[in-house]
């Protein structure tokens, strides 16, 4: 019998074992679609970003105008920009749901896959931050100023570090130039780390909703999950295109329609919606260094999750107490997101502090405690 090129060709056999003949659990639900959705988000962002970069000028006197020019004079430039800006929002929606899925079903017990995933999240956050600065509107400029300034809270080296990052004594042309360079580079780094993420995942195979070993009941990825993923792509692109066509500025800040002006501070400096939860945690501590540490901890805490798993069951499917806690955490994050968008005044300050405290309490104390309690109740 002639050898199948799909299985014998040095390159094709890698693709085959990753995307075609990959043995997959037969019972994975739609929550397992977000990995491929993140992949398609990344590809979309790189393609639209590349097209935008062809018309963008990384100079403080020209950046704002070059973006306006892209939207007004370039064929479908408005669409490319709207897809890129709103594509970032969908990227974050997908990654947050993907992390939530991993948390709920105990996928974090694949430690290498989980840790590379957290690194991917951090890189994505860095990419989105530097990208938001590029249009050089008011919120771009002041967002860059406020967030980079946080590094000055680091003892001893802080101020030097910030001036080194800025390339001067304030956010200016050198800052914009390097942010553009970083925004161009980081997505390719994300693509590289994604391959590592997938390599680690394919070492163990996918987890499943029951959290049990599924070797005895695997099915090929293609056609079952390739088709299911294609449906997922369609279901994501429909709202993305709807947003890009009908309400492209819904998630943006009106302040960014004003060119950057170092002499005028906007009344409310706030990041894009996907960073608001972390911004609320940052603001909840009335001390610069403390706030920066809490901000870092709010994301880095994900590295600790595998060590805080005390339950004898992997998934939360059959753990009602942990489920209640999980949805409390989700509600808590929504409250933090809302607080991050509000001005720093009563009652938002105290609500933010309570939500920030309960965020860390739920993750560090209650989850392991409830996991241990459920063991006592069940076994």
Curated annotation (Swiss-Prot):
* MF terms in GO: metal ion binding; ubiquinol-cytochrome-c reductase activity
Keyword Transmembrane helix in record: yes
Cofactor mode of binding and number, as noted: Binds 2 heme b groups non-covalently.
Instruction: Give the membrane topology, semicolon-separated if more than one.
Output: Multi-pass membrane protein
- Give the required cofactors: heme b
Q: Does the keyword Transmembrane apply?
A: yes
Q: Which UniProt keywords apply?
A: Electron transport, Heme, Iron, Membrane, Metal-binding, Mitochondrion, Mitochondrion inner membrane, Respiratory chain, Transmembrane, Transmembrane helix, Transport, Ubiquinone
Its localization reads: Mitochondrion inner membrane
Q: How does it assemble?
A: The cytochrome bc1 complex contains 11 subunits: 3 respiratory subunits (MT-CYB, CYC1 and UQCRFS1), 2 core proteins (UQCRC1 and UQCRC2) and 6 low-molecular weight proteins (UQCRH/QCR6, UQCRB/QCR7, UQCRQ/QCR8, UQCR10/QCR9, UQCR11/QCR10 and a cleavage product of UQCRFS1). This cytochrome bc1 complex then forms a dimer.
As for what it does, the entry says: Component of the ubiquinol-cytochrome c reductase complex (complex III or cytochrome b-c1 complex) that is part of the mitochondrial respiratory chain. The b-c1 complex mediates electron transfer from ubiquinol to cytochrome c. Contributes to the generation of a proton gradient across the mitochondrial membrane that is then used for ATP synthesis.
Q: Which residues cross the membrane?
A: 34-54, 78-99, 114-134, 179-199, 227-247, 289-309, 321-341, 348-368
Misc: Heme 1 (or BL or b562) is low-potential and absorbs at about 562 nm, and heme 2 (or BH or b566) is high-potential and absorbs at about 566 nm.
Q: Where a ubiquinone is bound, by residue?
A: 202
The protein here is known as: Cytochrome b
**Binding annotation for heme b b566:** 98, 197
Extract one GO BP annotation from the record. Answer: mitochondrial electron transport, ubiquinol to cytochrome c
Cite a GO CC annotation.
Answer: respiratory chain complex III
Task: State the similarity comment.
Answer: Belongs to the cytochrome b family.
Which positions bind heme b b562?
A: 84, 183
